[in-house]
Amino acid sequence: MTTIGNHMKFNVHRSLREQVRSFYIDVLQCTMIPSPAPNLELYLFPDKFVLGVFFCDESEVLSEEDHLKAAWLEIKTKDVQALKQRLVEFGVKEVEYADKSRFYFQAPGGQVFRLAPEDGGI
């Protein structure tokens, strides 16, 4: 059996640290856990998924446009409308996509996510 693990990392420009922190803690309600490095913040999702965000120089990060061509992730929630409202109020950039049944957006730093119901299938 093969599975995908519960850890992911990406690089974000160092100037976005406060915005990223607010996004993952205030909007997505993650918990920040201790990090082994000063340029790394670790965010724990309720399902025990750990996201590592490295704060880097411009030469080490993808542009928002490049993120549109990179891997997209999915965030599942019990209350899609409530989370979508928090995302919009925070100011995420909506991503236009053919699938209009879901809300696609870019987090601070450019990572693309799709918002889906927890029990909503594919």
Language-model-detected regions and their locations in the chain:
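Vicinal oxygen chelate
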Residues: 1-3, 33, 84-122
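Residues that flank catalytic or metal-binding motifs in active/ligand-binding sites
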Residues: 4, 47-49, 69-71, 101
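Generic recognition of long tandem-repeat/solenoid scaffolds
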Residues: 15, 42-45, 102-106
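Amphipathic alpha-helical segments
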Residues: 15-32, 86-89
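Mid-chain, well-packed structural core segment of small domains
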Residues: 66-84
